[in-house]
Amino acid sequence: LAKPFILTVDDDVAVLRGIERDLRGKYASTYRILRAESGKAALEVLTQIKDRNDDIALILADQRMPEMDGVQFLIKAREIHPDSRRVLLTAYADTTAAIAAINEVRLHHYLMKPWDPPEQNLYPVLDDLLTDWHAEYNPP
């Protein structure tokens, strides 16, 4: 069985590399880690994955991105992969966006950046979400 995907989306390449590094360090043995630099690029990736009948376990999206913000992206992502766990990342105490996301996107979690150390602030959250996803996951 093919490994499911984790997708992370952030327009800041340095931040994106850091997220990818943290994800690979912990999850590469069980998941395929993908990254995208915009909501538009990420939606193309999600569509390709769906067309191949592969699964996305988790989507991490930055809130503040040009063209399409994190909430707008996650709304569209949910249409393509409704079962994926959705996490909104923000560097700001952007409670308005968080409330909108929780209501509109059925957001699973809201994470503040930076989350160093990831062992304390990132992995426990993602472990719980991935456990939930696996509990509901029914491979075709």
Regions found by a protein language model. Name each.
Residues 13-37:
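Two-component/phosphorelay signaling modules centered on CheY-like receiver
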Residues 10, 61-62, 90:
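Active-site residues of response regulator receiver
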Residues 119-140:
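CheY-like receiver
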Residues 65:
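Receiver (REC) domain active-site loop signature in two-component systems and cognate sites
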Residues 20, 35-48, 70:
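Helix N-cap/capping motif at the beta->alpha junctions
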Residues 68, 72, 79, 92-112, ...:
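Alpha4 helix (beta4-alpha4-beta5 surface) of REC/receiver domains from two-component response regulators
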Residues 7, 50-60:
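Active-site beta3 strand of CheY-like receiver
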Residues 44-48, 71-85, 100:
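Short amphipathic alpha-helix used as the core "switch/output" element in two-component signaling
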